[in-house]
Every structure is written in C-alpha cells, then in structure tokens.
C-alpha cells in the first residue's frame, strides 16, 4: 500500500494514531534498522553496503513518574500538588538537608515534577505523550514515534528527558516568597582569611566572682562589615556601576510559564538595577567581607552557668553562652549562696562574733552562746543579684565548730578539758580516759590520785607545777571540798574525805579559784 508523504503527515495528526505511535515509542528498548533504498527511477539497489540508521528508544520518561515523585494521585488537583511540592521542597532543600549528598538531585526532581504538573497544558501533554511539547520541540520536532524527528541527519540515538526552563531555586522563591529559605548564606558578602561567615554563637568562660559581680569582657569575633577597599560600592576603586541591561534598570524580569506570566527579581542584577563591570577584587563585588573585630560583651551580674545572652554585633546577632567556674568557697542555689564558717569551742559555748567572706563585701555575724555545729545563719539580701527580677538572694552561713586535737593541746589545756570532762553531766556514752564512779561522779584514769574525787585537782596541780605557779595548800583544798553547788535540775551535796575531796563547786568558788591559780 503506497501512501504519499503529504497523506502520511495528515494521517499522523489523528489523535488515535498519535497515541499508538507514542505507545510504540515507549515500548521495550529496541534498535530499529531502516534500509534506505535507491530512488524509484534507478530500478536497482546499490552494490555497496546499504545505508542504515538506527533509532534507540528508552524508558527514561517512564522512569520519571512525576506523580510518584510528588507522591500524589494522577487525578490530584492543583492544591494537593502544591502542598506535596511544598513539603518535599522543604525536606530536600540543600540548605535544610546539608548532610544528604543526594538532596540537591532530589530537590531538582521535585521542582521538575511540580513545574510540569502545576501547568495545565504541560500536564495534559505529559499525560498524553509522557512529555511536554516544549521538550518535543527541543529534541528536533515531531511527536514521539513520528518519523525522523527523533534522530539527526548523521544517525544517532537520543533519550527523552525533561529540561526545566526555570531554575528550581527561582521557582521555589516565586511560589513561597523570598523569606522562607535563604538559598545561599554567603550571597551578600565574601569570605576572607578569618573565615566563611559571621560568628553566630560562642562560649565564654567566667570565674565565680565575675559571674556574681558582672564584668565587661573583650573577645575577638568574626563580623560581616563593609569592604575596606571599595567602601561598600562593590566596584574597583575609580570605577562606577552601570545600569543593568537585562532588566533595563527596573530590577525585575518577566518569566512566562505556559499561560501564566510571572514578574520576579532580576536574576542578573539581583534587583539592584545595576551592572558592575569591574567588581571589587577584595569583596568579589559584594560590598561586604568577613572581618575580625574586638567586641565588648557586657556580662550581667548574677549570671548562671549555661545561660545565654543575645547581643547585636554589626547587622547580625551574636549568642553568647556563659560557662561559670565552680567556687571552692561559695555554693550556689539560684540567687542564694551558702558558705561555711568555722568557730572555736569557746565561741560555740560562750558566744562571740566571726567574720565571713560575702559575695560583694565581708560580713560580721553574731554567734549566740550555745550554738551547735551546722547551725544555719541567714544574711537576708546578701546573696547574688537576680538576673530576671529585682533584688538579691540570701547568704546562708553554716556554722562548724572546730574541735582541737588532743595531740596538739598543751598540758594546761588538756588538764582543763579533762577537768571539765569529770564535771560534765548527761554524757551520752563514755569519755576515753574518764571513768565513771559508783556514786555517779567521774574520775580520770590516767595520772589520777588514788583518793576518790581527786582526779581533777591532781590534773590542775600537775599543770600548775609545770608552769611554776604556786599550789594551794591542803587546808584550802579541804575547805573547798566541803562547799556545795546547786544545779538547775537537782542539788547534790559533795563531801570529801581528807585531801582527796577536790570536786568542789562546779559553778564558782574553790575549784574555779584553784584552776585560775595555775595561771597566776
């Protein structure tokens, strides 16, 4: 059956035939040979090898299922397609997924799928032929499977693939605005020997005193500032920028996407309306560079470990996190501080005053008579300054009684302690070196007199003899032994036998006088 070329061209325009040809073109990859015969008037074929052209068809377009790329159904409306694109674009955007090396490729595929499916005409052509008319024309004319439109004059193979006419980044900005994503954080300044960008956060070490009282500390940080060479003009010194020829100085360009016409920022001058013929070599025509600056960081009084403050550095913000060193003296609980104060045994019994170190100045505290160990004294308003509120915290002083060691006491003090131990009442348990007598009294077991009740007197007499002091006579000791002393709870008469009745009155009188005589 012979069909002329003109009739064949008309025959190919029928929709049913076009669909069949398109289906045949996207069938299993194959290599088809075409034998070019001699003209009808020659009557015979050439004797040499026949001319053969091979056309390779592939499944590239079938592999790129744009509906599957966006994860939508084939009957999805424009709203669902846009929603799916927005979610996938955020997921695979290079600025938000820097760890995935394939993020850029996936973002490109998502953008391609959205550009086709969001346009009604391109979507209709894609549903019919598997590609758009724009790409068909880019491949050499003709629809898929139609004549020699799929291969060149010299005989070659080619695959059909989508070629976007709009940059994916530009498409994203057009749809969702300029402020959602910053595609390149270094677009408006150039890097330098100091780094690739401005410092956004840093950690500062502080002592406890610096954190408590506040301080101004100088640190060196990277900042983005005006280029020192071109003074922000972006041009080499001695030159000036000219008007952008691509947007005619308007700063905007018109982009046609099928039936829609969109006006966007000029991609050549980035909306500046100017064209820089001789850009500055220092800042690469960007007007700003990364520079090292000394910045004073005001540390607020009462700052805590791990807290972060925000401060303005140039045109950007710097977040400073403080790392406060632990103090060996102060213990912090929010705005309150706790310290320990050591007092002597005599101060604990008789009372007194002691000087303690404060947060801002030293403080004198009063120790009441009979203060026990670990007693807590509060100094109201003497703590740390509150950072997020008015006023100061409190300073709590924990009292600790310093007990002298028996090995470090001299004979006088040891004798006094042992004498007090013999007179002490309501002792929980037993004291080493002090024996309890049957009548309830106590007696020193080491170096004590054989007579009952003479332990304290013997201790005192030995200490007095060692220091050269005079020793009271026996008569005075006997008269002192006959004295009586009164307790708050009970009154007990002490009777001594001979020179060994040296208990005496514990609150005053003979025994106290005898003890004092050791130091006269």
From Swiss-Prot:
Q: Which Pfam families match?
A: DnaJ (PF00226), DnaJ_C (PF01556), DnaJ_CXXCXGXG (PF00684)
Renumbered to this chain, the Gly residues biased-composition regions fall at 496-511
Where does it live in the cell? Cytoplasm, Cytosol; Mitochondrion; Mitochondrion outer membrane
The UniProt-reported impact of residue 478 to K is: In strain: bIf and Berkeley
Where would I find the CXXCXGXG motif repeats?
227-234, 244-251, 266-273, 280-287
Would the keyword Metal-binding turn up in this protein's UniProt record?
yes
Coarse class of the primary localization is cytoplasm
Annotated PROSITE patterns: DNAJ_1, DNAJ_2, ZF_CR
Q: Where is the composition biased (Basic and acidic residues)?
A: 479-495
Q: Which UniProt keywords apply?
A: Acetylation, Chaperone, Cytoplasm, Developmental protein, Membrane, Metal-binding, Methylation, Mitochondrion, Mitochondrion outer membrane, Repeat, Transit peptide, Zinc, Zinc-finger
According to its UniProt record, how is this protein modified after translation?
Appears to produce proteins of differing size. Predicted to have a molecular mass of 56 kDa (TID56) however proteins of 50 kDa, 47 kDa and 40 kDa have been identified and named TID50, TID47 and TID40. TID50 and TID40 localize to the mitochondria while TID47 localizes to the cytoplasm. TID50 is probably TID56 that has undergone mitochondrial transit peptide processing. TID40 and TID47 may be alternately processed proteins or may be isoforms resulting from alternative splicing.
Tell me the outcome of changing residue 415 to D. Answer: In strain: Apxo
Query: J domain spans which residues?
Result: 65-130
Q: Which residues carry this modification: N6-acetyllysine?
A: 106
Q: Where is this region: Disordered?
A: 430-520
Checking PANTHER family in the record gives: DNAJ HOMOLOG SUBFAMILY A MEMBER 3, MITOCHONDRIAL
Other noteworthy facts: In strains Harvich and Apxo, there are 2 identical genes which code for l(2)tid protein.
Give the HAMAP family listed for this entry.
DnaJ (MF_01152)
Q: What is this protein called?
A: DnaJ homolog l(2)tid, mitochondrial
According to its UniProt entry, this protein's organism is Drosophila melanogaster
């Amino acid at each position: 059956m012979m069909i002329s070329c003109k009739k064949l061209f008309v025959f190919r325009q029928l929709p049913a035939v076009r669909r069949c040809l398109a289906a045949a073109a996207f069938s299993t990859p194959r290599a088809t040979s075409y034998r070019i015969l001699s003209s009808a008037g020659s009557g015979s074929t050439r004797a040499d090898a026949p001319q053969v052209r091979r056309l390779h068809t592939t499944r590239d377009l079938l592999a790129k299922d744009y509906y599957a790329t966006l994860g939508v159904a084939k009957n999805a409306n424009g709203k669902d397609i846009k929603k799916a694109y927005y979610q996938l674009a955020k997921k695979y955007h290079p600025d938000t997924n820097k760890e995935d090396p394939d993020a850029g490729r996936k973002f490109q595929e998502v953008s391609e799928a959205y550009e086709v499916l969001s346009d009604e005409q391109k979507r209709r052509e894609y549903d019919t032929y598997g590609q758009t008319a724009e790409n068909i024309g880019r491949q050499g004319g003709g629809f898929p499977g139609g004549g020699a439109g799929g291969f060149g004059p010299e005989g070659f193979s080619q695959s059909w693939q989508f070629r976007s006419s709009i940059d994916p980044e530009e498409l994203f900005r057009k749809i969702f605005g300029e402020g959602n994503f910053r595609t390149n954080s270094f677009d408006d300044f150039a890097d330098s020997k100091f780094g690739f960008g401005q410092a956004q956060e840093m950690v500062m070490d502080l002592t406890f005193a610096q954190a408590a009282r506040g301080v101004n500390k100088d640190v060196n940080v990277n900042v983005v500032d005006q280029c020192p060479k071109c003074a922000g003009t972006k041009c080499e010194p001695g030159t000036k920028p000219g008007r952008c020829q691509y947007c005619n100085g308007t700063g905007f360009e018109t982009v046609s996407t099928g039936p829609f016409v969109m006006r966007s920022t000029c991609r050549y001058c980035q909306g500046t309306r100017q064209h820089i013929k001789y850009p500055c070599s220092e800042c690469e025509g960007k007007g700003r560079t990364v520079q090292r600056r000394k910045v004073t960081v005001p540390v607020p009084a009462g700052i805590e470990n791990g807290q972060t403050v925000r401060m303005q550095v140039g045109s950007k913000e710097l977040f400073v996190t403080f790392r406060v060193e632990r103090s060996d003296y102060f213990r912090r609980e929010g705005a309150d501080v706790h310290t320990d104060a050591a007092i002597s045994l005599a101060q604990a019994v008789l009372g007194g005053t002691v000087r303690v170190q404060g947060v801002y100045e030293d403080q004198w505290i009063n120790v009441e008579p009979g203060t026990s160990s670990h007693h807590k004294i509060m100094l109201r308003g003497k703590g740390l300054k509150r950072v997020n509120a008015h006023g100061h915290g409190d300073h709590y002083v924990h009292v600790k009684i310093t007990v002298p060691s028996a090995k470090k006491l001299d004979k006088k003090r040891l004798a006094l302690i042992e004498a007090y131990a013999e007179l002490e009442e309501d002792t929980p348990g037993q004291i080493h070196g002090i024996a309890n007598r049957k009548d309830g009294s106590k007696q020193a077991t080491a170096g004590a007199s054989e007579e009952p009740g003479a332990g304290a007197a013997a201790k005192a007499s030995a200490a007095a003899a060692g220091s050269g002091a005079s020793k009271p006579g026996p008569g005075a000791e006997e008269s002192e032994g006959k004295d009586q002393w009164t307790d708050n709870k009970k009154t007990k008469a002490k009777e001594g036998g001979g020179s060994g009745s040296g208990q005496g009155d514990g609150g005053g009188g003979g025994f106290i006088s005898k003890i004092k005589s050791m130091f006269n």
